[in-house]
A protein has these predicted regions:
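Conserved catalytic cores of very large enzyme subunits
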Residues: 1-239, 260, 266-436
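Contiguous, well-ordered alpha-helical segments that form the cores/surfaces of helical PPI scaffolds
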Residues: 243-256, 278
């Protein structure tokens, strides 16, 4: 299935509220005579159908959300959840937690965890020197972020610096390409030598910049020669696209660097990782100034890269510290906590909040649940507590479940289907009783 992302707002975004729905460059309801629709428009405070804007259609928005989530929660004919599209739900201070649409979202989240949640609540504040919670002037705003996949998020404020504002350019952005840096190898090669580690990191960053600049030039040339005809139908060029640099294996970097005395869950490890992410942000900012092109820092998913890095390193450095065992070796993604870290989501949040907030190109924190959350209400309260008390930008709730081809969805992790086992046991007992 194609990798697709759908961003969902429960209230109409500010940049669309006053725009009219159109068809053939005219108002959708132009010359339409329908007394029932006109009466509904008047109930919504409009004197005519042609006076209606997108801001007047929130009831319809919510009906679409409910229908969409009903399909996602049901899954396919086997009860298997759909991998795509990935819905991103924008949680703002105007978000109404007590609507049928919100209930549909959190019923799905409690059962299969389809949604990613963009935090526009806790991320909007900082604590000042007096310990008071005050608005953060540098915070992302709902109109200034676009989620392009399961974690790539683009800061559209950078586009404002190019002139012309966001309107018309928000849907014309993306990433020209991604280069991921293997931090675990750096930790191994430069054990207990931070200066040498950063010197080599600088070399790798320059190589990443050179690679991304060459790719931008190549892709632009191909585009201008007419070799991307479908893209050219909706995209005027790649001027608003970011060059993305990502990182992988921060936890293993710290373990190798410290001789396995520290990891990213310790105070030393957390500070070491945070210092590096801040350093990377500054380097990327300087690349943007040098090249005139947009750059960002992403906690890249690295679904395949994490294994490839680990396997290539194992060939070269037999004693390098890695996650996993035997043939199933890998590096912990970006600056995430190790996979075997405890099951307390709030402990994970406390450790990751500052790190997760440092990326400019997107990141996501998975809060793993051992099984289905008891109810939509309980799931709602969990998400609400997280986004109100933490500033990290992007989270997802991930309940563990199993799928049987015969019985569909089963809460929790099961190697064998308990319902199938019950049926087999019943058959066995029936045969035994007949034999007796």
């Amino acid at each position: 299935s194609p990798f697709t992302n759908v961003t969902i707002d429960m209230t109409c975004p500010d940049d669309l509220k006053t725009q009219i729905p159109t068809h053939n460059n005219e108002h959708l309801f132009k010359n339409l005579c329908d007394e029932e629709l006109l009466a509904e428009a008047k109930r919504r405070g409009k004197g005519s159908l042609e006076a209606m804007t997108y801001g007047d259609f929130e009831p319809e928005m919510n009906r679409i959300v409910i229908a969409f989530y009903e399909v996602l929660t049901t899954g396919d004919k086997c009860g298997q959840p759909f991998t795509f599209p990935i819905p991103t739900v924008n949680l703002t201070e105007e978000f109404d937690w007590d609507t049928p649409a919100a209930d549909a979202v959190f019923e799905n989240t409690a059962k299969v965890g389809s949604s990613y949640f963009q935090n526009f609540i806790g991320s909007q504040y900082i604590t000042n020197e007096n310990g008071e919670r005050v608005p953060n002037p540098k915070a992302y705003k709902p109109g200034a972020v676009r989620s392009m996949c399961c974690r790539l998020q683009l800061d559209l404020r950078e586009l404002l610096k190019r002139g012309g504002g966001l309107f018309g350019s928000a849907e014309m952005t993306g990433s020209i390409g991604v280069v991921t840096i293997n931090l675990a190898r750096l930790g191994y090669l430069y054990k207990n030598n931070e200066e040498a580690l950063y010197a080599r990191l600088d070399e790798l960053l320059e190589l990443a910049k050179s690679t991304l600049e060459k790719k931008r030039k190549f892709v632009t040339e191909m585009f201008e020669r007419g070799l991307y005809p479908y893209t050219k139908r909706y995209l005027p060029g790649f001027n608003n696209h970011f060059s993305t640099i990502g990182i992988n294996g921060a936890n293993e970097m710290i373990r190798n660097f410290s001789g396995n005395k520290e990891d990213i869950t310790t105070e030393f490890g957390r500070k070491f990782a945070l210092k590096m992410v801040e350093y990377l942000r500054e380097k990327i900012r300087s690349f943007q100034e040098q090249t005139g092109n947009l750059y960002n820092l992403e906690a890249t998913p690295a679904e395949g890269t994490t294994y490839r890095f680990a396997k290539e390193d194992k060939k070269r450095y037999a004693d390098i510290i890695q996650a996993g065992f035997d043939k199933n070796i890998y590096y912990t993604n970006s600056t995430q906590l190790p996979a075997n870290f405890g099951s307390d989501p709030f402990e994970a949040l406390a450790m990751q909040d500052e790190l997760q907030s440092s990326y400019t190109g997107g990141t996501v924190l998975h809060l793993y649940m051992k099984e289905r959350i008891s109810s939509a209400q309980a799931c709602k309260q969990l998400v609400k507590s997280v986004v109100q008390n933490y500033k990290l930008p992007y989270i997802t709730i991930t309940p563990i479940f199993s799928v049987c081809h015969k019985h569909g969805y089963i809460s929790g992790e099961h190697e064998y289907c308990p319902k199938c086992d019950e049926e087999l046991l019943a058959e066995y007992k029936a045969k035994q009783s007949k034999g007796a």
